[in-house]
Amino acid sequence: MKKQNNLRSLAAQAVELVVEQGQSLSNVLPPLQQKVADKDKALLQELCFGVLRTLSQLEWLINKLMSRPMTGKQRTVHYLIMVGFYQLLYTRVPPHAALAETVEGAVSIKRPQLKGLINGVLRQFQRQQETLLNEFATSDARFLHPGWLVKRLQNAYPTQWQRIIEANNQRPPMWLRVNRTHHTRDGWLGLLEDAGMKGYPHPDYPDAVRLETPAPVHALPGFAEGWVTVQDASAQGCAVFLAPQNGEHILDLCAAPGGKTTHILEVAPEADVLAVDIDEQRLSRVYDNLKRLGMKATVKQGDGRYPAQWCGEQQFDRILLDAPCSATGVIRRHPDIKWLRRDRDIAELAQLQAEILDAVWPRLKPGGTLVYATCSVLPEENRDQIKAFLQRTPDAALSETGTPDQPGQQNLPGGEEGDGFFYAKLIKK
């Protein structure tokens, strides 16, 4: 029997850990979900994701309705009130239930003396909702993004920045990758239809299927048997551009959690793949994915800047570098990114990307292919990065993706399409 915890207080604690301590929601949420009944896990997730998606608005409302912020040991109450606002604005939870459960959350976080305050603020919001929302619609907070990121997007995409922001604020579609070693995409779509679900093929990525309605993985035909994997359509572009062949030595660098490693092996089952990532904990997910799909690869922990430590003098026919980045292309999937990143991070990430590129390029055989990929939409990490690399690397040439002036292919997030993603395909002369 699961403990019956107050969902609203758990959501408030999760958001506080993300915003105040810089922890990622993917690390914070699973242990909290263990504290609630199975039937409540989806609502807990919705409250956490929703509050982080709309955090700017909820913060703005608190500042309008409270004379001073909650601080110190009372800080969790600040986020509990946000959870209350979110329910009233964006969920189908009946207002009386949202109010009662949120107020009761004060008991769970050992602040029962603040129940009256929480109740008062939420009721005041209900009374003034229309006026407040009209005022909010003209405020700087309306974009639901930190100001530094709005400025960067405006500079990079003068005519498209609002579309990018709108896409980031949407719920993401659920994309799958059909394992071509088991089924054709059309064949698996037939199995999906037999299971009472509908999916749509992607026009450019041959294994990609978008579910009409997101579903739990255990409901997908053959998921446990490795027939299908959850992976965004744009991420599937990496293996498409890499075009791995059987018998080749292939390096998948920054490989965790293993989605691209396994895609490479689906396309070229007899390739010799080395998957490397700096994060030992995340490598466990690479092993899990390989096991579920019945595949084999060499998996090593290592820093991409120092290849001698993990591959000696070995050279590769193809290298996929899915570089560490700001993840500004996947905000709709991970809304905590907006609050975990800082403006100063971008220059640091660009420097790290350049160091890894320079370190692994000598490990590519002449005539070999390196695909540089990020899930960022910022030019400093993408086109500017590749332009600078081509200028300082005489034996590197761009292939298929873009022009020397505008190197690479930049996918922007949006609608039912894939996430924001960048690829540059480079050939060693």
From Swiss-Prot:
Q: Which PROSITE patterns match?
A: NOL1_NOP2_SUN (PS01153), SAM_MT_RSMB_NOP (PS51686)
InterPro entries on file: MeTrfase_RsmB-F_NOP2_cat, MeTrfase_RsmB-F_NOP2_dom, NusB-like_sf, NusB_RsmB_TIM44, RCMT, rRNA_ssu_MeTfrase_B, rRNA_ssu_MeTfrase_B_ent, RsmB-like_ferredoxin
Give the main EC class: transferase
Superkingdom to which the source organism belongs:
Bacteria
- Coiled coil located at which positions? none
Please give an example of a GO cellular component term from this record.
Answer: cytosol
Binding site residues for S-adenosyl-L-methionine: C254, A255, A256, P257, G258, G259, K260, D277, D303, D322
Q: Where in the cell is it found?
A: Cytoplasm
Entry keywords, A to Z: Cytoplasm, Methyltransferase, RNA-binding, rRNA processing, S-adenosyl-L-methionine, Transferase
Q: What is its EC number?
A: 2.1.1.176
Q: What does this protein do?
A: Specifically methylates the cytosine at position 967 (m5C967) of 16S rRNA.
Q: How is this protein named in the record?
A: Ribosomal RNA small subunit methyltransferase B
Query: Taxonomic lineage per UniProt?
Result: Bacteria, Pseudomonadati, Pseudomonadota, Gammaproteobacteria, Enterobacterales
